Structures are given as C-alpha cells and as structure tokens.
Design a protein with these regions (language model features):
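Residues that define the transmembrane beta-barrel architecture of outer-membrane proteins
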Residues: 207, 236-240, 265-269, 308-312, ...
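Transmembrane beta-strand segments of outer-membrane beta-barrel domains in Gram-negative
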Residues: 283-437, 495, 515, 556-557
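C-terminal transmembrane beta-barrel domains of outer membrane proteins
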Residues: 398-574
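Repeated loop/turn-to-beta-strand initiation elements of outer-membrane beta-barrel proteins
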Residues: 196, 221-223, 250-256, 279-285, ...
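Outer-membrane beta-barrel proteins
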Residues: 231, 246-250, 272-279, 315-323, ...
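Transmembrane beta-strand segments that form the barrel wall of outer-membrane beta-barrel proteins
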Residues: 221-231, 242-248, 252-264, 271, ...
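Membrane-embedded beta-strands of outer-membrane beta-barrel proteins
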Residues: 211, 242-244, 271-273, 314, ...
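Periplasmic polypeptide-binding modules associated with outer-membrane biogenesis and secretion
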Residues: 24-231, 259-268, 410, 429-432
Length: 574
C-alpha cells in the first residue's frame, strides 16, 4: 500500500484557506444576511393621521350675565367633586352668560374623555339666582357589543370571536372605559383577515352605551414576488424571492407565512404560523427555516465551500398598550439554529446556537411640522454556542477566539419619519448591538449592503458590536416617482476580546475597530402594472474614503474594487 504525503506547505495553505472561508463565507453569515433583509421596516409613505380632540370655541355674547359662586355635582363616582370644581374654576366668581354656563357643563364630558371615560353632564331645572349651580352627571356603562353584519357575507373570522375580543376587557354593566375599548378594537382590527371599525350608540338600558362593530373581510392571502441584486458575490448577487401570507385560514385570526429565496448559490425557505391565545391580544407562533448555500465565485471556489442551516423558533407577542397615537408591545422567542459547513466535501463545522430573547417595541405618532412617526425597539438575547459536534480543529479555533459557550447581547433600533410637507420627508435610522463576548458569524452585526452602508458590498465589515446610522431626505415627484438623497455611517468592533487564547496574538487580521461611511441617491417608482401594485428602485452610492479594513490586496471581502455601488430591486404584489 502506498501512502502519499502532502508537502507541509501545501497542507498549511489548505488549512489557511479553509480557515479564511469559515470567517468570510459560511452558513451563519448567509443566514444572517437573509434575516437582515427580512427585518427591514418599510418606509412610511404618507403622513400619519392622529385624531385630535378640539376644545369647543369660547362663546362671545352680549346676553344677560350672572355670577356663579359654587358648583355642586350629582352622579359622579369616577371623578371627585373637588376635581370637577377645580376644572370649572375659571367660571367661578365672575359674570358669565347662560351660554357660557352651558359651555362649562359640556366641557365636563371632555374631562371625562381625557381620562378614558364617557359621561354626559346636564343642567336640571333650578334657581341659580343665588349663584349655586347643580350639575347632573351620568357616567356611561358598557352595554355590550352589537354586530353590524351582512347576511350575504361569509366572514373570514367568525364575528363572535371578534365580539369576544371587545368584551374581554369591557364587561357588560361595568363603567365604560374608552381606552380599554379603543385598545380592544385596535387589536381586533389587527387580526389577519378582518378590518374592524366601531361606533358608539345608546344601549337598551338607560345610562348604557353599546359598541356597534362593523366587520369587513380582508383578502384570503397577500403575496409578493421580487428580484434584486442584494445578495453576496460569493453566492450570487441576483436574488429571486416569493412571499405569501394566508390570512385566517382557520377562521380564528391565525396567519401562515411562507417565504422562498433563490440565487445562483443559495436556496432558502421559511414557514411560520401564529394565532391569538385568548382574547387579550396575546399571540404565539412557531416558525422554521432551511438554507443551503454553495460558493460560486471568489478565491476559495476551488475548495468547493458549501453548507446548510436550519432554524426552529417559538415566539410570543403581547400588546401592553394600544391607542391611535402610541403603541407598546412586549415580545419573546426561543430558538435553535443548526449550521453545517463543508470544504472539499469534508465537514469543516457542525454546531448549534441556542437563543432566548426578550424584547419591547413602541410606535409613536406626532404632529411636529405636518406629522411624523417614531418607532423603537430594544432586545436582550441570552445565547449559547455549542461547537461540540464540529471537528477538533474547528473547536480549538473557537476556543482560541473565545466564541464558545454563553454570550449576552443587547440590540436596539430607532426609526423616525418626519413629514415637512405633503411631498418632502426625512428618515433617520439608528440601530446596533452590544455584546459581552466574541460572537459567531450568525450573531454578528454587519455594516455593508443595501440595508446598511450602501457604498459597501453585502456582509462587508462585521463585528460582535456595532451600529449603523443613516439620514435620508425624500422628495415625492410626479408620475409616482420618489427621489432620495442619503448618508450612511457604520461602526464595527470585530472582537470584544481581541487576544487569541492560544497564541496571545490579536484575533483580528486587520483593524479590530473601524468605521464605514458613504453617500448617494435613489429613485423609486410605485404604481400599478395592470392591476398589480409594483415597485422599482435604483440606488447609487459612493463611499467616503477607502475601505478601512480591506483584504491584503486592498480589495473588498468579495474581491471587488468598486468606485460606485449600484443596487436594484423590483417587486409586484398580488
């Protein structure tokens, strides 16, 4: 038997190349790239509308006047007489007209509404010549919900289910809480498959108010197909995507989402299901995804790098507060990710990442300038990286780089859209993450790409910590076009602990901390192709200064040396 022995320099070169592959292109990086594009928030395209309560106008009249020295109240339980007296103090001990007195009485209903209640105030027949005025207050009670249904319509969600959402936090015969009622209606309206509005009407009993619900069906499904060049050079920049959502197929406010993605070197699929739990607004669900990649370009192509990734996640979401102008939600998920990477058909790595997440998000509409909206989120991740099933050489490298074991991560995102006129708006974004440990590629923060610093390729510039800031100015043009100018800035810190545990040398091959920045412009068209809503966008971007963390030959991680970057995307909705 003949035994062939490779020269040591060839063996060293092969191991070095395989090590570089694991850092540059692997299943964790590819999955992270896809999940980043999926989580992008669509830009607000029109000013948000906020319902504002307007105070009744002050009356000016020359009618006979009289002086009120004291108000007394009857029927008030939710607001004390002292508080009502203070509210009406501007009408005390001065000459007022009868119309002004009526205005004062009517304003009490505004006070109640500001506190989330419905009440009517009236003046009974009385002698007010002594300056004592008695006001009768009727505090509304909830009489229940009434359904306004079309007998010829088969509703996507059983109307009785929607009715239970309203009555869950609004008990019949109890004091009508407008805030609780509004929250329940908004939650019901968010159920997939139904559009819910309400109006208040007099109940069957004196002092009661009913909620009249108007329910309309939404489509059975919504779908979108798209093509873009947002992918990486190594696995094919041109990506084809198809996404479909099936709204309430079980008739209970449930939702099924299916997503598919294909490029020359990548295939990805994701399936999710979620449904309401009870009638408080709590939703829970489960989702799974699978990824397969093959490197089709780049210096490492001869090693035939390939790999897979699978994820399984259980999630929950609860609306803590809902109103027309402000939302606050809590969310949590538990997930497992499994990654396998090969080079020259040999297993390079086989490992798991387990993650427990707790997060909160809010959304606030404002009336600054024309109008605006701010959304923010914060997430805490507790994770564990388990490389025990990987080859010993890979395990050793992860121990040396201190990425094995437990890690904690804090992530945040802030997005503000402000409308100055009907056609001019700005968008400010700031998001990032902090970590207490060196992270695996699947958990890192990436700077480059169409959703990051747009002057750099996808997945360029990654770190265990980092942040991105972008500022955009949008101008609506004629013929459904929008022009945008933007500036992007990103910072990344590759390793929290930059000292190799085995050698004492630095883990980072270049700079451990660096920033990337660029500017550019885009043009977007939104309209209809036939009866299908469609979009097309083109982005041009140019970097400010050179790549701060280039390859040895001065190129980007994908081998390119672009002076300008161009991104394209086209989509069609069904």
């Amino acid at each position: 038997m003949q035994i062939k022995i490779f020269p040591l320099n060839c063996l060293f070169l092969t191991l070095l190349l395989m090590s570089q592959i694991s850092l540059a292109v692997d299943a964790g990086d590819q999955l992270n790239q896809i999940e980043r594009s999926q989580n992008k928030k669509e830009r607000l395209r029109s000013p948000p509308k906020i319902e504002e309560e307007k105070e009744p106008p002050k009356l000016k009249t020359q009618a006979a006047t009289f002086k009120v020295s004291n108000f007394s109240f009857e029927g008030n339980k939710l607001i004390s007489s002292n508080e009502l007296q203070v509210f009406l103090k501007e009408y005390l001990n001065r000459e007022i007209t009868l119309d002004e007195l009526k205005l004062a009485v009517d304003s009490l209903s505004v006070l109640y509404k500001d506190k989330g209640y419905l009440a009517t105030a009236s003046l009974p027949k009385q002698d007010i010549t002594e300056g004592n005025v008695k006001i009768i207050i009727i505090e509304a009670k909830f009489g229940g919900t009434q359904l306004k249904l079309d007998p010829n319509t088969k509703y996507r969600i059983h109307p009785e289910i929607i009715q239970k959402f309203i009555e869950h936090s609004n008990q019949k015969g109890e004091v009508l809480n407008l805030n609780a009622l509004d929250r329940a209606v908004l939650i019901a309206d968010e159920l997939p498959g139904a559009a819910v509005t309400q109006s208040l009407q007099s109940g069957t009993k004196d002092g009661e108010t009913d909620s009249l619900l108007n329910i309309n069906n939404e489509p059975n499904y919504v779908a979108m197909v798209s093509v873009d060049n947002y992918g990486s050079h190594a696995t094919g920049p041109v990506r084809y995507q198809a996404n479909a959502s099936f709204l309430s197929p079980l008739g209970i406010g449930d939702r099924i989402d299916l997503g598919l993605l294909h490029s020359k070197g990548t295939d990805y699929a994701r399936l999710s299901f979620n449904r309401p739990i009870g009638y408080s607004g709590l939703r829970m669900g489960i989702n799974a995804s699978a990824l397969k990649y093959d490197v089709i370009a780049g210096a490492a192509l001869s090693l035939n790098p390939e790999g897979t990734a699978e994820t399984l996640q259980m999630e929950g979401n609860y609306p803590v507060y809902r109103s027309r102008a402000f939302d606050l939600s809590l969310a949590s998920f538990l997930e497992r990710k499994h990654f396998r990477n090969k080079a020259q058909e040999a297993v390079e790595s086989n490992y798991f990442i387990d993650l427990f997440n707790m997060g909160s998000s809010l959304n606030h509409k404002n009336t600054l300038f024309l109008a605006g909206e701010t959304s923010a989120s914060i997430d805490v991740d507790l994770g564990y990286a388990n490389y025990d099933d990987s080859p010993l050489t890979f395990q050793a490298s992860k121990i040396e780089q201190a990425t094995q074991g437990r890690f904690n991560r804090l992530r945040w995102g802030i997005n503000n859209t402000q409308f100055f006129t009907d056609t001019i708006s700005s968008v400010l974004k700031f998001n990032g993450q902090l970590s207490d440990s060196n992270l695996d590629s699947s958990q890192k923060f990436y700077l480059g790409g169409a959703n990051g610093v747009r002057a750099y390729p996808t997945s360029e510039g990654s770190g265990s910590e980092g942040y991105l800031f972008s500022a955009e100015l949008h101008k609506e043009l004629t013929a459904n076009f929008t022009a945008t100018g933007f500036y992007d800035y990103g910072f990344a810190r590759q390793y929290i602990d930059n000292t190799n545990n085995a050698t004492g040398a630095e883990n980072a091959t270049g700079k451990n901390s660096f920033n990337m920045k660029g500017y550019g412009a885009s043009l977007e068209w939104i309209g209809f192709v036939g009866s299908y809503r469609s979009t097309f966008s083109a982005i041009w971007s140019r970097r400010i200064h050179n790549n701060p963390n280039p390859q040895a030959d001065g190129s980007d991680s994908d081998g390119s040396r672009p002076g300008n970057f161009y991104w394209f995307k086209a989509s069609m909705s069904f």
